[in-house]
């Protein structure tokens, strides 16, 4: 590989690396970026093998950076998917207590959701659980109508495509391992 100089390098081409590359290119459109992925394709590991759930902040401590970023990021993710025609479905989610001993944990999760401003979140009973999800049994539950699923591989690929479209000097290298990083002290 010939020697190239880039302003910013991102290592890893999963959803986090792809989103970082995309956001950096958006923030610094004249900078020459590189994304380096050791696998033959982007989103090869966790990103390409997860359930695709769009998280809405149920499990994060209210007021924490994780909760704040989750709330902000979910809206940005859904808007990005709509704008770029990426498969997604806001199908809702049921969180279930299968025994009375789990109800106190369910109440904590509900409280987190309310404090994290999750739209439409509500407590549901066993009959309502069956109505929404006939194959699920529970004694108590939470309905989160704004949760959904998304094609995270499609998101990662589209973020890279949009970033490269912003600056064609930026590059993505797959099947490339990072073995050493040196910082030029003069810059």
List each language-model region with its residue ranges.
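Short loop/edge segments at beta-strand edges and connector loops
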Residues: 37, 90, 124-126, 174-176, ...
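Helical element adjacent to the flavin cofactor pocket in flavoenzyme catalytic cores
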Residues: 142-187
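Glycine-rich FAD pyrophosphate-binding loop
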Residues: 25-49
